[in-house]
Curated annotation (Swiss-Prot):
Catalyzed reactions per annotation: L-glutamate + NH4(+) + ATP = L-glutamine + ADP + phosphate + H(+); L-cysteinyl-[protein] + hexadecanoyl-CoA = S-hexadecanoyl-L-cysteinyl-[protein] + CoA
Protein name as catalogued: Glutamine synthetase
Organism: Homo sapiens (Human)
Protein's cellular compartments: Cytoplasm, Cytosol; Microsome; Mitochondrion; Cell membrane
Annotated binding of Mn(2+) 2, by residue: 136, 196, 203
C-alpha cells in the first residue's frame, strides 16, 4: 500500500509557522464529496474577514475532471457552501466548509445527494425527525493490514477487543482520542466513541441531529478523521467488510425518531414505521451503500451481528435483525428505533432521505417518488 511520507515530517517545525499571526485574514477549507460518492476532496481559499454564517461564504469552483465528476472538455464544477464548522487543524478563526457540488448548468452533481435530501427534509420539518448514526471504521497500517495486526498472520480471535482496555486489546486509541477532541472543537455533534469487536475497528456516534444536519455533521466528522489519520500516518477505511472471514464487518447503524415517537405511547408510531419499512426492504438496501447494495452484500450475511441482506426482520434488543427496538424503548413505549442495515461507507444523506420517504411520506415501491418543485 503506497502512502504519503508526510506523517514522518517534523511537526514541530510546522508548528513554528502555524503559530504565526494571520492578521484579519481567514482560511476557509472547502470540502466536497467526489464522484465515487465515498471520497472527500478539499481545497482552501483566503477570506478577508471571518464569516458569521454559511450564507456569507462565496461560491467557488474546481476541476471536476480530476474528481470523477465531469469530462475535461467541460470540467468546471461549482462549490456551493452548505454548512460551516470551526477548523480544528488551523484553529479559530479559520473554517471548514462542507459544500454541495453543481454542474456547469447548475444542476446537482450525481453524487450531490444532499440537494434532494434537503427538499425531502423540508417537507416533514413539522415532525422534527431526529437521527443518530453510529459510524464504524477500521484503522489500516501502511502495510495494508489493519493497524497493529501481524504482517503475516492474525491477532487472537474476537472477544476481548470490544470496548477493550490495554495495549493488547486497544489498537490505535491515540487516533480515536485526537479525532474526538477535534470534532468537539469543530462543533460536530459527536456523542461518543468506543472500540469495536474486531481489533483496530472503532466507532464514533454522531447525533442527535435534526433533518439535513445529520448528513452534514457525519460527513465533516469523516473528513476530520481522515485528516487526523493523515497526521498519524494511518489510513481509516469505511469498507463494510475490510477483512473477509470470521471478523465483524463495519456498519453505520442509524437511529431514527419523530416527535410523535418520542412522546407518550410513541411505540405505536415506531411499529407503524417498521411495518412500512418491511414492505420496502430492497429499496432501502440499494440506498444504504454507494454501490446499490453490492458492498453490503459482503457484510449482511446473517452472521457477526448482522441480518441477511435478502430478508427483513425486526425485534426488541435483537442485533441480528434489520431493525432493532432498544429494550428501554420497549419498556417505556416511546423513543426511537435503530436501522442496522446501512453500511459504514453509506452516504448519510441517502440513508436519512430513504427513511423519511418510507416512514413519513408513505412511499411504496422500488423507486423514490419524484415530487414537483
Amino acid at each position: 500500500m503506497t502512502t504519503s511520507a508526510s506523517s514522518h515530517l517534523n511537526k514541530g517545525i510546522k508548528q513554528v509557522y502555524m503559530s504565526l499571526p494571520q492578521g484579519e485574514k481567514v482560511q476557509a477549507m472547502y470540502i466536497w464529496i467526489d464522484g465515487t460518492g465515498e471520497g472527500l476532496r478539499c481545497k482552501t481559499r483566503t477570506l478577508d474577514s471571518e464569516p458569521k454564517c454559511v450564507e456569507e461564504l462565496p461560491e467557488w469552483n474546481f476541476d471536476g475532471s480530476s474528481t470523477l465528476q465531469s469530462e475535461g472538455s467541460n470540467s468546471d464544477m461549482y462549490l456551493v457552501p452548505a454548512a460551516m464548522f470551526r477548523d480544528p487543524f488551523r484553529k479559530d478563526p479559520n473554517k471548514l466548509v462542507l459544500c454541495e457540488v453543481f454542474k456547469y448548468n447548475r444542476r446537482p452533481a450525481e453524487t450531490n445527494l444532499r440537494h434532494t435530501c434537503k427538499r425531502i427534509m423540508d417537507m416533514v420539518s413539522n415532525q422534527h425527525p431526529w437521527f443518530g448514526m453510529e459510524q464504524e471504521y477500521t484503522l489500516m497500517g501502511t502495510d495494508g493490514h489493519p493497524f497493529g495486526w501481524p504482517s503475516n498472520g492474525f491477532p487472537g480471535p474476537q472477544g476481548p477487543y470490544y470496548c477493550g482496555v490495554g495495549a493488547d486489546r486497544a489498537y490505535g486509541r491515540d487516533i480515536v482520542e485526537a479525532h474526538y477532541r477535534a470534532c468537539l472543537y469543530a462543533g460536530v455533534k459527536i456523542a461518543g466513541t468506543n472500540a469495536e469487536v474486531m481489533p483496530a475497528q472503532w466507532e464514533f456516534q454522531i447525533g442527535p441531529c435534526e433533518g439535513i444536519s445529520m448528513g452534514d455533521h457525519l460527513w465533516v466528522a469523516r473528513f476530520i478523521l481522515h485528516r487526523v489519520c493523515e497526521d498519524f500516518g494511518v489510513i481509516a477505511t469505511f469498507d463494510p467488510k475490510p477483512i473477509p472471514g470470521n471478523w465483524n464487518g463495519a456498519g453505520c447503524h442509524t437511529n431514527f425518531s419523530t416527535k410523535a415517537m418520542r412522546e407518550e405511547n410513541g411505540l405505536k408510531y415506531i411499529e407503524e414505521a417498521i411495518e412500512k419499512l418491511s414492505k420496502r426492504h430492497q429499496y432501502h438496501i440499494r440506498a444504504y451503500d454507494p454501490k446499490g447494495g453490492l458492498d453490503n452484500a459482503r457484510r449482511l450475511t446473517g452472521f457477526h451481528e448482522t441480518s441477511n441482506i435478502n430478508d427483513f426482520s425486526a425485534g426488541v434488543a435483537n442485533r441480528s435483525a434489520s431493525i432493532r427496538i432498544p429494550r428501554t424503548v420497549g419498556q417505556e413505549k416511546k423513543g426511537y428505533f435503530e436501522d442496522r442495515r446501512p453500511s459504514a461507507n453509506c452516504d448519510p444523506f441517502s440513508v436519512t432521505e430513504a427513511l423519511i420517504r418510507t416512514c413519513l411520506l408513505n412511499e411504496t415501491g422500488d423507486e423514490p417518488f419524484q415530487y414537483k418543485n
